[in-house]
Structure formats: C-alpha cells, structure tokens
C-alpha cells in the first residue's frame, strides 16, 4: 500500500496511515463498507469504518474523523493467519515461514460473551462479557465487532430495516 499526509505527526498519522499500511503488508484488508470493495468479505464496519483498516474521516458516510487504535476481528483473523503460516487464502500467495518460534509458558486468556441471542431488527441492545487471564499478567480489555458483510461499497448509512451488513460500529474498550 501507499499513502501520504501533509502533517505526518500524532495518532492520526501513526494509526490512520502507518499502522494501516503495515496492516496491508500482513494481508489485512479494508473493513469499511463505503468507498471501495476489497473483494475479501472484510467490509464489516458501517460507513467509513472506525478501526485501523477502515477509512475513518476519508469517505462518506463518515463514522468518525480518524481511526481507533485497534484492528477489527476480521483483520486479527487474517493477519494472524498470515503470520502463523506465511500464506493468505484470499490472494493465493505463499511467502513461506521465516521465523524462529519460541515456546512460552503464558496461557492465552479466555473470554465469555454469555448466552447467544437473536436480536430482532431495530431492537436496542447492550452487550456484556467477562475475561480471565490464568497467568494474572495482563490487564484485559475487549470490544465487540460485528462480522456481517454487505455488498460494498454502500453510499448509505445503516438503515433500521436492514437485515444484513454492518449495522453497528465497534468502540474502544
């Protein structure tokens, strides 16, 4: 990827530009539902998006002016898969493995989002969850990401009667 800024300083530059372009180098694709279509079913954020791989503030309908400093679930999934295997399913490109793995004793944290529910259209909702780190070494934070794509690009904001596509945005923990 490539990009530029007349004012390359601060979080808007480091998150919206640097982290975004590094995300592309690890096969993280765009998450915004407006402006363009990646073709990889990653358009899971409404409007211009709000996470690192979105175009917050760049393409209407804008959700916010700059990206929040976190990757969406679809990017964590895809970038993580590429890091582990050196392969990306979407573009059929294999760079091979060039790392030296080191075993660590730290156990992965667990998360519990509670019961599954089907929420009818246009129904307000509030989500809660818990997390636990067996090693007690980390302060855990989390957020909720919707994982429903729509045929992008869309020029409209989410509508109350939509039955598919991104209907809500993630927020920083």
Indicate residue ranges for each PLM-predicted region.
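Extracellular (secreted or membrane-anchored) zinc-dependent metallopeptidases
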Residues: 1-173
